[in-house]
Amino acid sequence: MIRLIVLGHSSDDKGTQLESLTASILSSLKYTDIIMNVVGKGGNELDVVAKYSTPHISGDLIHPVVCECKAYKSKVDITDWPKFLGKFYTARLEDSKAMGIMIALSGANGNVVGAYDGILKKNVPISLVSGDDLLKSLASVFKMPPYDIIRKKVSYYTDDHIHS
């Protein structure tokens, strides 16, 4: 697995860049009405919101989507997870078709992954995206070559070990 990093002047700058990358991924997947930095009801700060349409016999079903983007150097821990769930379930109270996505640049710790796995077993429309899944999405959006090709090109210029 490649470790993805976002370079920026501050943690806010890095977060904004990850939000922009998330918006680009959603746009490439045909999500619509993508807006960054929305303050929802009750003062909930939502990093990215969008809508996703699925065909239905009586017309398209529109699913609101709330995204939380974490550009931390370390893995997302259990203190961030309930905050995201609160935002997600608030959106579900407004529209039962709402979906939630947490983008975790450096992944999530075992407690978060365990909690996420438990929620998935209940068929809740929520996603935790990090690591290879995030890289694949970005590679698709930005037409990046596969990791092996990047590694070969870099090794042409240096003998230093490439950490993955």
Outline where the language-model segments fall:
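Mixed-charge (Asp/Glu-Lys/Arg
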Residues: 1-164
